[in-house]
Amino acid sequence: DCLARANERAGTALTMRQLQNYQRAWLQREGIDSAIAGILRGKAAQQCSPMAYSHVPRKDVLQIWRRYLASMGMTAVVLAPELEQGAVGSRLYPSVGELARLLGNYQQYLCARLSGSRQQRPTLTQYHNLLVRHSLLILHLSTAARPVTEMYGRRGDYCLISRFIRLTDKEGRSVSSARLVPLSALAVQQLQAWERYLTYLACQREPLLAPLVSAAEQALSGAGALLFWAVEAKDGSLEGTEIVTPNSMMRQFENLLPLAPNWHRHSVRSHLLEQGVATEFIDALLGHEEMGTEFTNQYSSAALSDLFTLTDVLDKWHQTLGLKVMGEWTIH
């Protein structure tokens, strides 16, 4: 009815579809983040994944809305200041200060475990799981990968020279979602520490460590999972190994970082959005591209090296959070 009256006053014959197409084209032309674009287009979080993973201040959404109306010669209704406060979207985004405190407490606990007296220090099996957990944490906050079985694949899925890792964390619409994403400086250092540890482990000749030794050899050759847990029996002895799964990650993290399994995806995307990173880079990292608009599709002029814009931002973020590499401590 409103559109019909507007057409009558202006002598036009615009349809709702035409208005929607214009809005979509304007948002794309202006390079508006896909989360904000989804909100302005009236989509639900189930229809627009970036909305679900982004913590967006209301004032930012309203600012874009006013720009859009101004492009058509219109003005928005002035809202009371309190109505522009707060945020929409993800509720799993801790602020930088809160996350830094949480990670600080976790790393303080980790250092205490590793620097205590010989009687208090972890066994090799316990150390192994501490190292796997820390490696996962750093890779999570670098790649924003979805929690899946055999997390981060195998050794051949990444290259420390080119600083890229291949993620295969979701298959949908009969089209592979495999993608190359850049590794942050901290992720490269942690993977180097993990490889050194695997090499150390593969050289062990203690019969009781045979399951770990075998898994390390498989990981180094690329024939087995890169990351795996050590499973302890009730008496504390090594029982075997277990590949990394979403459920096993929850068990290992819940006592120290009691957050949802995919909290890191919310945190990474929200931080990149806050820092003004282009939406095409963010969506390429999280695997949120729409079909036909992929970052590296055949009609794109983008280069993979452009994605290092992401690591420039993430490296500074990791420094602010106080994240450190684990793997340089003496193994007992």
Residue map of PLM features:
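Short, basic (Lys/Arg/His-rich) helix/loop patches that form interaction surfaces
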Residues: D1-I39, K43-Q47, Q119-N129, T143, ...
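Short, flexible loop/turn elements at secondary-structure junctions
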Residues: G31, A44, P57, L141-T143, ...
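Short, charged phosphate-coordinating catalytic segments
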Residues: S34-I39, R133-I165, V277-A284
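Catalytic-site neighborhood detector that most strongly recognizes the C-terminal catalytic loop/helix
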Residues: R41-G73, V88-A100, L285-W329
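Conserved tyrosine-mediated DNA breakage-rejoining catalytic core shared by Y-recombinases
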Residues: Q47-M51, D60, N105-Q107, C111-P122, ...
